[in-house]
Amino acid sequence: MIVIMYQQLIAHFDSLGGRELKFSPGAAVFHLGDEVRLVHLVRAGTIHLVRNQADGSALILQRAGPQSILAEASIYSSSYHCDAHAQSAATTWAVERSELSAHLSGSPSFAQAWSQYLAHEVQRSRLHAEILSLKTVGARLDAWMAWNEALPARGLWSHVAQEIGVSPEALYREMAKRRRS
């Protein structure tokens, strides 16, 4: 079901006038407060939607990989409410917000595929919120691993720490504790 939904959504995106944009690792796709002009479908790489906290930490709100729509709720907003940065070399298909909005109004099949995508993203966001509500690093890590099945390569653990809302050091301590057990 989800695969079919994504295929329909991507087919609609491909039919819209847009342009391919490339981002190098670390490059900004947009910043907090920027006017929303484009909606990005990630074709390759990973782009993070990030909210920077007052204490200097960053909370990842979305890890948009291939076939993900970056900051999909931005179509309903005049400005972005967070930052987006490429975590790796990334390519997007960027569609004008106004064209996407018009297509949603004029195509029931696209509106249905869009609604299904948003519903799936709500489910993922609820899981993320649940992880962040857990009190211990261990509980957060357990919940994250239940959803993702395995940790990424060791060099990417700091990304997991950001995603579950803990410092990299706290995650490393938890990992060391588990290795000793």
Whereabouts are the PLM-identified features?
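Cyclic nucleotide-binding regulatory module and flanking cytosolic helices
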Residues: M1-A27, I69-L70, I75
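Short, flexible helix/strand-to-coil boundary loops that buttress conserved ligand/catalytic motifs
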Residues: Q53, A73-S74, E96, L104-S107, ...
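Phosphate-/nucleic-acid-contacting segments
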Residues: K135-S181
